[in-house]
UniProtKB/Swiss-Prot annotation:
It is found in: Nucleus. Belongs to the Mediator complex subunit 6 family. This is Mediator of RNA polymerase II transcription subunit 6. GO terms for cellular component: mediator complex. Component of the Mediator complex. Interacts with MED2. Residues 248-257 have a biased composition (Pro residues). The keyword DNA repair does not apply.
Length: 298
C-alpha cells in the first residue's frame, strides 16, 4: 500500500502543469561525437555567419556544454568570447581559434586553470554552416594504422591464394608432361619391338641392344676424309694474287764477272759445236778453277 501511494504521488508530480515541472538538466556532450553533424538552415537564413553571431549558432548544437564559462557570460549579457572576462575564470570554456567568414570557423574546447594555463580538450569546426567535431590525433593515427594493416594482410592473402593457384597449375602441367612423355615413349618402344619381331632392322637400336661385344674392342682409327671446298680455294687464290700484285717487282740479277760464262751459255755452245762437227775444249770457270798458283797451301 505504501508503494502504491508513492507511485501515485510520483505520478501527480510529473503529470502536473508544465509551469510547475522542473526541466531535467542537459547532459554534457560526449567525448567522441565525430559520427554526427549539426545544421540549422532556418537560423542560417535569419542571421549572418560572422564573429558576432557564430557562437550563438554553435550554442544550438549538441556539441555545446551549458556548464562552460561562456554560458555564464551570456547570462550576464556579456559577449561569450570576451577574453578579458574568460581569463579571470576557471573551468571549461570555448575559444574561437580561427575564422574565415563566412565559410570556416574553428572552436577549441579547453580547461582553464589560470590566466595563462589552459589545457586543450576537443576541437570543433563549422564548415559552410555545418558543425562537426574534429577527430583526435590518436584516433586518426589508429584508423590509418588499422587500414594499413588491413590492406597489407589482404595483399598477402591475395598473393598467397595466387601462389597456391600457380602451384596447382604447375603441378597439373608437370603431371600432364610426364604422362605425355610416358605415353609417347611407350608407343615408341612398342613400335620398335614390333619391327624387331618382324625381322626388320631398326637403325641404331639393334646395335644398342645386341652388339655389346664390339663395345669392348678398341675402335679402329679411320683417317678423316678431308673435303675440299672449291669456293675456299678460289678465295685463297684471289687473296694470293692480290698480294702478289701489291708487292714490288724483284730487282735484276747482278752482272757476271769478266770471263765468267754461265752453264746455260756453255750448254748452248756445246750443242752448236756438236751440230757443226767440231769439238771445242770446255772453258774453265775463272771463279771455280783459279790454277795452282792461286790455291792456298796448307
Amino acid at each position: 500500500m505504501d508503494s502504491s501511494l508513492l507511485s501515485a504521488a510520483t505520478a501527480d508530480t510529473f503529470n502536473g502543469n508544465a509551469a510547475d515541472q522542473i526541466p531535467p538538466p542537459l547532459q554534457p556532450p560526449g567525448t567522441d561525437m565525430t559520427g554526427i553533424s549539426f545544421r540549422d538552415q532556418l537560423w542560417i537564413n535569419s542571421y549572418p555567419l560572422d564573429r558576432n553571431y557564430i557562437f550563438d549558432y554553435f550554442a544550438l548544437s549538441p556539441f555545446y556544454d551549458t556548464t562552460c564559462n561562456n554560458e555564464i557570460l551570456r547570462r550576464r549579457s556579456i559577449h561569450p568570447l570576451d577574453l578579458s572576462h574568460l581569463s579571470k575564470m576557471t573551468g571549461l570554456e570555448y575559444m574561437l581559434t580561427d575564422a574565415t567568414e563566412p565559410n570556416l570557423f574553428v572552436f577549441r574546447k579547453q580547461k582553464r586553470d589560470g590566466p595563462e594555463k589552459v589545457t586543450p580538450m576537443l576541437t570543433y569546426y563549422i564548415l559552410d554552416g555545418s558543425i562537426y567535431q574534429a577527430p583526435q590525433l590518436c584516433s586518426v593515427f589508429a584508423a590509418r594504422v588499422s587500414r594499413t594493416i588491413y590492406n597489407i594482410s589482404k595483399a598477402f592473402t591475395d598473393a598467397a591464394s595466387k601462389l597456391e593457384t600457380i602451384r596447382q597449375d604447375l603441378q597439373v602441367c608437370l603431371v600432364a608432361i610426364v604422362l605425355s612423355l610416358s605415353v609417347n615413349l611407350g608407343s615408341y618402344f612398342l613400335l620398335i619391338f614390333k619391327l624387331m619381331a618382324n625381322g626388320e632392322q631398326v637403325y641404331g637400336f639393334n646395335k644398342f641392344l645386341f652388339d655389346t661385344e664390339n663395345q669392348n674392342e678398341p675402335a679402329e682409327s679411320k683417317p678423316a676424309s678431308e673435303t675440299v671446298d672449291l669456293k675456299e680455294m678460289k678465295r685463297v687464290d684471289v687473296i694470293l694474287t692480290s698480294l702478289y700484285r701489291k708487292l714490288a717487282p724483284p730487282p735484276p740479277p747482278p752482272p757476271f764477272p769478266e770471263g765468267y760464262v754461265s752453264q746455260e751459255a756453255l750448254g748452248e755452245k756445246e750443242e752448236l759445236g756438236t751440230q757443226g762437227g767440231e769439238s771445242q775444249p770446255p772453258q774453265v770457270d775463272p771463279i771455280i778453277d783459279q790454277g795452282p798458283a792461286k790455291r792456298m797451301k796448307f
